[in-house]
Amino acid sequence: MRYLPLFVYLNNKPVLVVGGGIVAFRKVQILQKTGAIIQIVAKTLCLNLKTTLFKKKIIWIGKVFQISMLDNVFLVIIATDDTDFNDMVFKYAEKRHILVNTVDDPAKCSFIFPAIIDRSPILIGISSGGQAPVLIRMLKEKLESLIPMSIGYVASLAGIWRNKIKQHITDIVYRRFFWEKLFYNGQISLLVEKGNFRKANRVIKDAVLNQLHNRKQGSVSLVGAGPGDKGLLTIRGLQVIQTADIILYDYLVNPDILDLSRKDANKICVGKIAKKHSISQNNLNHFMIQLAQQGNNVVRLKGGDSFIFGRGGEELQAVSKAGIMFQVVPGITSGIGVAAYAGIPLTHREYAHSVVFMTGHKRHQGDYKINWSLLSDNKQTIVIYMGQLNAVNISKNLICHGRHIYTPVAIISRGTYLDQKILIGTLIELEKLIYMVKKPTLLIIGDVVSLHNEISWFGNG
């Protein structure tokens, strides 16, 4: 380890910045957040530094560097393009055992600035010691996207309660379990993201009381897993999955997504394939509520988006009625994700001015209560979930109500997976084509399907 990572307290500490250009200004911006007393020595100041000086955020102590300027300085930042001058200042500072950073010159640095992820009071610094700055930038971008902005306020809230909880929960092991449960639960982060700070504070207070009285709190998170490819899971979805105590998932959820959960999370398959349910909807609702009431952070993980033909609304009605805290994390619905992976734009100025999503699954026996005339517009794209179930009936009704028999049709199975299969035909051919692919399938009907051959980019076209 060439560099020791440290977090330095600079509040009211004198820091000398040598240089007055834009590079110096960038370092000043970082230093301002620490409360340091920032002194500048430079012949001239760039416009940004002049503005900062006008606001009295920095002190311009001189135009020419003097050795005496190093007196009582905590650290020095050198930001000029004069190599010889930089070397001189560095040597003077080194002799006085003052920490020095010379911008973009690691050989003249006794400390370096890491890439900083600021979720104050939580701070993360990343560095390669100057070996791979582009790689560090990529890592920073990755972490920035994964760490919620709310985590800083959550940490501050925990700091406010830390001593009180220490007084109430004296056993160090139980206290650690308390904090782990509180943070894994995700309720506080959810409330903070909504701006409900008072309720977030109340959750901690209630958690302390519940701990003292041996009561538990739980929650339900409805998460859309996307159409298949685990890369289409949202960042928010990943964050919530990783807080789950129990995951209730459908058959269609990619196992690779389940592998992203905590190792100690209990994963339970609850079915949900058309005409093949391992558990009834009412029993599932009751089971989910029961788990949450036992104090578990329950994630209900569904393929696609939970609110589009996913019965998510029905499940949350039951959860809400039971008085359990819940949240919803949208997912990329199959109609959009699968179409994109098939190279089929659902709208196009030349071919389609609107798109309709419908399901091929009927809740009860009998005919659809569908306005077929509305779907007969040849400038409209129709996307049918679980389309294999009633494809013949759908085809006949569309043709009967004026849809052209040669309207292009796409039948897609295992969409967004590497082994996805796409069959292209026409509306009149749908009856025979539908049995050539495995369930579940997505049907796309409309002239936009003709673009598949031109812009197909993924899988088996």
From Swiss-Prot:
Region of interest: Precorrin-2 dehydrogenase /sirohydrochlorin ferrochelatase: 1-204
EC number(s) reported in the record: 2.1.1.107, 1.3.1.76, 4.99.1.4
Keywords: Cobalamin biosynthesis, Lyase, Methyltransferase, Multifunctional enzyme, NAD, Oxidoreductase, Phosphoprotein, Porphyrin biosynthesis, S-adenosyl-L-methionine, Transferase
UniProt GO BP: cobalamin biosynthetic process; methylation; siroheme biosynthetic process
Uroporphyrinogen-III C-methyltransferase as annotated region, ranges: 218-461
SUPFAM superfamilies, sorted: NAD(P)-binding Rossmann-fold domains, Siroheme synthase middle domains-like, Tetrapyrrole methylase
Pathway assigned in UniProt: Cofactor biosynthesis; adenosylcobalamin biosynthesis; precorrin-2 from uroporphyrinogen III: step 1/1; Cofactor biosynthesis; adenosylcobalamin biosynthesis; sirohydrochlorin from precorrin-2: step 1/1; Porphyrin-containing compound metabolism; siroheme biosynthesis; precorrin-2 from uroporphyrinogen III: step 1/1; Porphyrin-containing compound metabolism; siroheme biosynthesis; siroheme from sirohydrochlorin: step 1/1
Binding site for NAD(+): I22, V23, K43, T44
CDD domains: SUMT
Catalytic activity field: uroporphyrinogen III + 2 S-adenosyl-L-methionine = precorrin-2 + 2 S-adenosyl-L-homocysteine + H(+); precorrin-2 + NAD(+) = sirohydrochlorin + NADH + 2 H(+); siroheme + 2 H(+) = sirohydrochlorin + Fe(2+)
Phosphoserine modified-residue sites: S128
Residues binding S-adenosyl-L-methionine, per UniProt: P227, G303, G304, D305, I308, M386, G415
Active site: D250 (proton acceptor), K272 (proton donor)
A GO term for molecular function: sirohydrochlorin ferrochelatase activity
Functional summary from the UniProt entry: Then it catalyzes the NAD-dependent ring dehydrogenation of precorrin-2 to yield sirohydrochlorin. Finally, it catalyzes the ferrochelation of sirohydrochlorin to yield siroheme.
Family statement drawn from the similarity comment of this UniProt entry: In the N-terminal section; belongs to the precorrin-2 dehydrogenase / sirohydrochlorin ferrochelatase family.
Protein name: Siroheme synthase
Gene name per UniProt: cysG
